[in-house]
């Protein structure tokens, strides 16, 4: 090596900012949860769909500005120039599972059944500033019906969501699906004379803060404005008090039951045909949910659900977990939302020029998994494999035969493949793997046709709880005939 040639520094072994690694239980518990949800989706006639992690920026719905890269929010790059000249395509990692569905529905519209019912689960990527609990890669779990304008599709999605939450482990009474309709608000804005476009968008952005600032805060923001907690003044939308009242009546029209809420909404929309249509759709959804056995203790009409109203075109729904947990400061708080969805028409319109109605739901995978752990339904230490220790290198085939017999019996097992010189290190390895049992057979045991079966769980419990006399009287290691190895391990594992 030349003296003036600098030695390359070693790369840092670190996870990129905003990303994380998943180990053991994180992976298996997420898979178990998603498998349970998939069973419900499949039972409802939905088909799985896997799409590429990479889409063209054009298909994702991002538009190239007058700069060298697409809009912020996606991880995007431009391919090399195509042969013969010309710029290469802009590609990006998918930022959700809905945009790829739109592309698939347009690309294969001649082959897919209509309506097309699909579910999809997988990672998505956002090129956003990371923060506590906010990552650039995360999992989504979606189910959508494309091609049906019937509110029966919306009702079915809500019923399926309830079944999926329960099958995943959330008990009935610990969740509530709340349903609203964008058309009802459209009717109210129409009757107020609020034009579509920016005025209506300003109202939508304002009522989105209802759960944070309450009725009085929204009233101020719809009219003249208000000071926030920091003392800064936030400009209001500029509606008159008379114009603001119908919006507030809409937000606060929840009654004692669905019948009461629907009656209040009918009064709130007045003579608006659009609003009346929205109320009737909610009434139909409530009737169909009741027919499917989903009562008001599981799903209700609730006009205070406003998140997403700016995106959806019809019914909107949100699943909220109602049990309490302790926050980082030890204070009680309700767990909150774990899923949301609604009707969005125009899904395929960008590709075909034709409106295609669709409705769907997205479950927050990490949030639902955190909820199951908070309830003690997941998050326990995952049991590792039975570890077959190695006492004699020359007899490795015998040890592998033991592991193979255990696996054939449906028992997770492995042979220790590290340096077998120190037996204590083998037991430390088994402990680190959270192994329930260790198998030991030296030359003496092999000659006698026996094995030692060490119950590591019982051994740890005895060591922690028993007196020395009790410990001697309850050995956690037993000797059995080699032919009885599988039966003894089964007995210990229960």
Swiss-Prot record:
Location in the cell: Cytoplasm
MF-aspect GO terms: ATP binding; histidine-tRNA ligase activity
Keywords recorded for this protein, A-Z: Aminoacyl-tRNA synthetase, ATP-binding, Cytoplasm, Ligase, Nucleotide-binding, Protein biosynthesis
Catalytically driven reaction(s): tRNA(His) + L-histidine + ATP = L-histidyl-tRNA(His) + AMP + diphosphate + H(+)
Region of interest (Disordered), residue spans: 1-20
EC number: 6.1.1.21
Domain of life: Bacteria
GO cellular component: cytoplasm
GO biological process: histidyl-tRNA aminoacylation
Primary residence: cytoplasm
Keyword hit for ATP-binding: yes
Gene3D superfamilies registered for this protein in UniProt: Anticodon-binding domain, Bira Bifunctional Protein, Domain 2
Enzyme class per UniProt: ligase
InterPro entries, per database record: aa-tRNA-synth_II (IPR006195), aa-tRNA-synth_II/BPL/LPL (IPR045864), Anticodon-bd (IPR004154), Anticodon-bd_dom_sf (IPR036621), His-tRNA-ligase (IPR015807), HisRS-like_core (IPR041715), HisRS/HisZ (IPR004516), HisRS_anticodon (IPR033656)
Parts forming coiled coils: none
SUPFAM superfamilies: Class II aaRS ABD-related, Class II aaRS and biotin synthetases
Similarity comment: Belongs to the class-II aminoacyl-tRNA synthetase family.
Subunit structure: Homodimer.
The name this protein goes by in its record: Histidine--tRNA ligase
Organism encoding this protein: Paracoccus denitrificans (strain Pd 1222)
